[in-house]
Amino acid sequence: MAAPRRYFPGIVRALLGAWQVGSHAGREWVSPPGSLLGNHVRCVSCVVGATFSGPLLASASSRYGQDSALDRILGFPQPDSSLVPCVPAVSVHRDEQNLLLVHTPDMPENPRVLRVVLLGAPNAGKSTLSNQLLGRKVFPVSKKVHTTRCQALGVITEKETQVILLDTPGIISPVKQKRHHLELSLLEDPWKSMESADLVVVLVDVSDKWTRSRLSPQVLQCLTKFSQVPSILVLNKVDCLKQKSVLLELTAALTEGVVNGKMLNVRQAFRSRPSTHCPGPETEDPNTHAVRSPQRTGWPYFQEIFMLSALNNKDVNTLKQYLLTQAQPGPWEFHSGVLTSQTPEEICANKIREKLLEYLPEEVPYSVQQKTVIWEEGPSGELVIQQNLLVPKESHVRILIGQKGLLISQIAQEVSQDLMDIFLCDVLLRLSVKLLK
């Protein structure tokens, strides 16, 4: 499959496909009038794509208008770096992505590296923050819990420094994992990622008044077991708080009044530094860490505190610059063209699942099975994707299709736009909803 053409964001075409009834998965049959749902296999397709007229050139950089890592490997001439975006695109080809992941890193003379684990309760905003730090929305995000089902990896490469982000599922207890029949990866991945971490970012959603005043027992257990790993505290979604004084109380509670081994004068720090990066405390208390309470609700070993709104990108760059400064001399793990370890098919499936979680009620999105049946180049050079969405109940079929097919059309259109932003190419997506038998 040749690489799809570069897309033009201003030209997006959405077509609602025909209603389909029949047992032939590869064909489209129009249903009889007045019989939208019968006793056959039901499915509805929605096609969303974009068109762009222009020549298909030889190298990826000329096609995409960006610096292609594979072009650098193959020796293609590169455009002026000042005219191209810094964030690499993800290849639409699995083989190219895998080749890039195992390719020898193009390290500078003095490389620096940092492995960062994002830790927090479910739905704290870890994936949203990861996307903001990376500069592309490669990780799925929704308001429902357990959107991230397994550990995902993102890579930030700037000049001599490479920061590797490990976006883990929300940390849960074994009891909850068994009770809700959740994947074992939701329980194990946060702990496994800590074994190779250089820095831990603990994320707390301050908009949740029920959980914001204390770290979860699972997070505290993880921090305690890996206490040798440096950690920082990030208070997320601070823009949701009407009374900023609440931040002072939360900071004191979540740090037990101690940051970087010193007593934290929260009020003085907040008055002297109105920015969202709280400076280290002023006076030292060497005996603070000697007491370990079994009822601990905070962690007194955080090196720094950051307050930000990941959704609005407020002060995310401040955190990013801090991470870059914490990198230590060492070899890079990935080529500078790597943005994520996910395959293009995984990114697509996760993006579709993100929209299902966002728009479908209650348990419905968790019952949907996804199956990609087409991933190929279209007649105009676009990336053509077809994915079947299998649901167990007729009522779920109707919910997912929506009135006159508007919901499935909206989902396909939004996913297509997200994929075009990630792959930097035309995307023609077809979603078919079918009753699982």
Swiss-Prot record:
Residues 236-239 are annotated as: G4. GO terms for cellular component: mitochondrial inner membrane; mitochondrial matrix. GTP binds at residues 120-127, 167-171, 236-239. The modification Phosphoserine is found at S173. Residues 146-150 are annotated as: G2. Residues 120-127 are annotated as: G1. It is found in: Mitochondrion matrix; Mitochondrion inner membrane. GO terms for molecular function: GTP binding; ribosomal small subunit binding; rRNA binding. GO terms for biological process: ribosomal small subunit assembly. Residues 1-20 form a transit peptide. Keywords: GTP-binding, Membrane, Mitochondrion, Mitochondrion inner membrane, Nucleotide-binding, Phosphoprotein, Ribosome biogenesis, RNA-binding, rRNA-binding, Transit peptide. Residues 360-437 form the KH type-2 domain. InterPro entries: G_ERA_dom (IPR030388), GTP-bd (IPR006073), GTPase_Era-like (IPR005662), KH_dom-like_a/b (IPR015946), KH_dom_type_2 (IPR004044), KH_sf_prok-type (IPR009019), P-loop_NTPase (IPR027417), Small_GTP-bd (IPR005225). Residues 308-310 are annotated as: G5. Residues 112-330 form the Era-type G domain. Residues 167-170 are annotated as: G3. It is a peripheral membrane protein. Residues 272-293 are annotated as: Disordered. Pfam families: KH_2 (PF07650), MMR_HSR1 (PF01926). Belongs to the TRAFAC class TrmE-Era-EngA-EngB-Septin-like GTPase superfamily. Era GTPase family. Probable GTPase that plays a role in the mitochondrial ribosomal small subunit assembly. Specifically binds the 12S mitochondrial rRNA (12S mt-rRNA) to a 33 nucleotide section delineating the 3' terminal stem-loop region. May act as a chaperone that protects the 12S mt-rRNA on the 28S mitoribosomal subunit during ribosomal small subunit assembly. HAMAP family: GTPase_Era (MF_00367). PANTHER family: GTPASE ERA, GTPASE ERA, MITOCHONDRIAL. This is GTPase Era, mitochondrial. It comes from Rattus norvegicus. The gene is Eral1.
